[in-house]
Amino acid sequence: LHLCDRRQRQMCIRDRDKEIIFGDELTIDHIVWMGTQPTLKEKSERVGIRETLPSAAIISYLHKAVQKGQTVHYLPPYRPEHKLKLMDWLGIPPARQEGSVPFIRAVVAQRNYKSAEEIAEIEKACDVTADMHIKAMEVIRPGMYEYEVVAEMNRVAEMNNCELSFPTIATINGQTLHNHYHGNKIKSGDLFLIDAGAELPSGYCGDMSSTVPADKTFTSKQHAVYEIQNAMHLESVKALRPGIPYMEVYDLSARVMVEGLKGLGLMKGNADDAVREGAHALFYPHGLGHMMGLDVHDMENLGEVWVGYNGQPKSTQFGRKSQRLAIPLEPGFVHTVEPGIYFIPELIDMWKEGKKFTDFINSVSYTHLTLPTIA
């Protein structure tokens, strides 16, 4: 989609100074079921590629290139069927299909920098995404089921000719980071955590997180946690500028959370030390954000170490290792800012039993399982 603007099952090859699309024309059977379609040649010419060959010709083409000593560059395959094709074409077993680093870095160098036209598309996707979240806030009430709220959000996407950019998270059990179950009945006092986005026909994606009180207003306890999470978000946005490593913004958001939770009696000690040691991850076990574009986690299949770390190794520390973007921000980058505060019973129990970070976590933290998760 990025390299030749096509969604159809075709293969694009660049060989020195020429570009070729390998694919097959539709048969009458295809036309009966799919209707009249542009020919392969017409679709190729729309994106400036004039040479086309049948898909069956790709194997001999690649084999000849290898025999001539040419290096065949390819991106890491994301789908299982592509792994099988690469094994058929190049004889590389799926376990060894790591992709070509120079090709990966070249694509990342292109796609990390969004053009004005791309940014306009992402803004449209984010506008629809925001409307989806607002609709959830409008319709939610005790007695509804989660799937009823999700249906209203989906309707907003469909009414704007959009698909979902990823499977919607919409749940009263927000302590589970990736919870796609929507069968719970919403009760008075519940918080409804949403992580959802819209995808435009062009392929560009939106992604936002929000937390909605079922009763339309927060309880005092919920509001206290919300204010900390909101401060994490606002301080992170305020810190954004070209040149600042996004990992520094992550650390800032974590320090803001630690200071806030100290005010609630849940954490103690020096915030810088707590974040450096990783104590904050009891309540903040995920990253702050990621690149956005044609993928909601843009270029996820190319590897975070290249997209978000420019080849540098990632941290292995719990919480910090989930940060997808660490490199200095540059003009043209588009990324999310999604801090959260989570109270995960199983994680809290494990840390309590192991007496982890007692210099930073008050024992009272382990009795506050009723505190709300806010993202």
Regions found by a protein language model. Give the residues of each.
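Short beta-strand segments
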Residues: 22-24, 74-76, 171, 195, ...
